[in-house]
């Protein structure tokens, strides 16, 4: 609902809104899916909802996680969206996601151009993305006979006794070193140059964008 509020009468703004599948089934968010019905693409911006579906919330399965792709597409099509599904368990999913994001962006621009050229667009069907990955993906897969990745357990404190338990400490070390931090950070300047080049310029970072906090900056440096 906050994302949709931000784009009202703000035609140049596109908000990518990431929603977890547990969050998505709560009352307030479940209702907010229908706000697309109040958007005029001629005068307002657009929201690109991204439902991150990993099948579990903090202590159990989610509703969306128990639905087939066909059921998910039917549901969100009924909500007025054009659903696009991305799923996978390996690094290829990043390329798939990049491609789908570009497709979704072009669809949004096409709808807006048509509406702003004077054509009456009734009930525009904006895209939304369903990103399906395992719960706790890239984390600890199993520990002491319990399945962690792909389970609600990955949402808990997985290794509470790593300080004293050698098995848990080894699992923690294997997990964290799998991210190859030495390839990402430099001891003297933090992030390596390849990472720094990907960072947005000042003014374009999410935390400094006025749309993320409702207006011009109200907290200033002393």
Predicted stretch roles:
Residues 23, 46-222:
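Conserved acidic/glycine
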């Amino acid at each position: 609902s906050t994302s949709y509020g931000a784009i009202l009468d703000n035609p140049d703004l596109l908000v990518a809104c990431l929603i977890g599948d547990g969050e998505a089934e709560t009352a307030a968010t479940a209702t907010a899916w229908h706000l697309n019905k109040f958007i005029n693409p001629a005068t307002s911006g657009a929201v690109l909802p991204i439902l991150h579906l990993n099948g579990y919330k903090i202590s159990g399965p989610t509703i969306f996680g128990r639905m087939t792709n066909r059921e998910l597409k039917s549901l969100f099509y009924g909500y007025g969206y054009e659903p696009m599904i991305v799923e996978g368990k390996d690094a290829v999913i990043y390329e798939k996601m990049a491609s789908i994001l570009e497709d979704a962006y072009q669809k949004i621009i096409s709808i807006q151009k048509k509406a702003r050229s004077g054509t009456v667009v009734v009930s525009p069907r904006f895209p939304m993305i369903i990103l399906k990955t395992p719960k706790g993906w890239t984390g600890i897969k199993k520990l002491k006979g319990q399945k962690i990745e792909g389970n609600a357990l990955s949402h808990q404190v997985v290794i509470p006794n790593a300080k004293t338990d050698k098995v848990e400490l080894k699992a923690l070390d294997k997990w964290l070193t799998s991210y190859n931090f030495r390839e990402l950070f430099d001891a003297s300047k933090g992030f390596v140059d390849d990472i720094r080049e990907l960072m947005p310029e000042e003014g374009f970072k999410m935390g400094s964008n006025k749309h993320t906090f409702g207006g011009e900056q109200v907290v200033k440096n002393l």
